[in-house]
Amino acid sequence: MERIDGVAVGLCAHSPYLRPFTLHYRQDGVQKSWDFMKTHDSVTILMFNSSRRSLVLVKQFRPAVYAGEVERHFPGSLTAVNQDQPQELQQALPGSAGVMVELCAGIVDQPGLSLEEAACKEAWEECGYRLVPTDLRRVATYMSGVGLTSSRQTMFYAEVTDAQRGGPGGGLAEEGELIEVIHLNLDDAQAFADNPDIPKTLGVIYAISWFFSQVVPHLSLQ
């Protein structure tokens, strides 16, 4: 997962996942404009494996995070790209710079698929757990990336067991996914969320906090 080489950067001319726009508007009589991206809505799912007394998370390489870390360490690395020809980065970082711990998640891009069905699909593809929509509890729906996008993300929770794990997970190779499934012991979860040295998403921190607030008081952890 962390063996990354041959990194080159070019301008994005077309993407099925995002599209840039500029919104022009007048606010209190003042003419303004704002750049934004149209992106897909998404779902995340926090799973608690009661057989292992652990939270099910995923770890994967995120190219955008990696590129941002390269620019942060070597300012100007992304400014000289050519739209016609991607340029290899002259200075790079180890692949670990782009690896994140996250919730199982995915974009909602299939017409006719409910949010619950999309979450079940991701639970199987990424983590190997078989779920049906009735297994899910909706935690929250919120806006993500409000300065740049208008996408909504919906978080679900499900309690699972080892018996529901029928596959290895790992994501879909044909979609470029390479995912490691993590079973985080409950005894370590809060320290994990509080540790600033472990690269993780805000969703993981929120989900763990929600779990200990809303679920743990009602669990039998004997």
UniProtKB/Swiss-Prot annotation:
A motif (Nudix box) lies at residues 111-129. GO terms for cellular component: cytoplasm. Coiled coil: none annotated. Transmembrane segments: none annotated. It comes from the Eukaryota. SUPFAM superfamilies: Nudix (SSF55811). It catalyses: UDP-sugar + H2O = UMP + alpha-D-aldose 1-phosphate. Homodimer. Hydrolyzes UDP-glucose to glucose 1-phosphate and UMP and ADP-ribose to ribose 5-phosphate and AMP. The physiological substrate is probably UDP-glucose. Poor activity on other substrates such as ADP-glucose, CDP-glucose, GDP-glucose and GDP-mannose. This is Uridine diphosphate glucose pyrophosphatase NUDT14. The gene is Nudt14.
